[in-house]
UniProtKB/Swiss-Prot annotation:
Keyword Magnesium: no
Gene3D superfamilies: 3.100.10.10
Recorded GO MF terms: rRNA binding
GO cellular component assignments: ribonucleoprotein complex; ribosome
InterPro entries: Ribosomal_uL15/eL18
Assembly and interaction partners: Part of the 50S ribosomal subunit.
Protein purpose: Binds to the 23S rRNA.
Family, per entry: Belongs to the universal ribosomal protein uL15 family.
Keyword field contains Transferase: no
Protein's name in the database: Large ribosomal subunit protein uL15
Keywords, alphabetical: Ribonucleoprotein, Ribosomal protein, RNA-binding, rRNA-binding
Amino acid sequence: SVALQVTVDAVSGSAKEKITAAGTVTELV
């Protein structure tokens, strides 16, 4: 369960970073 949660957190974190990066690019454009 802990390992699964860590995986979920890692994927969630990556998604948030991608969304933030996309938002930054959008702001620059």
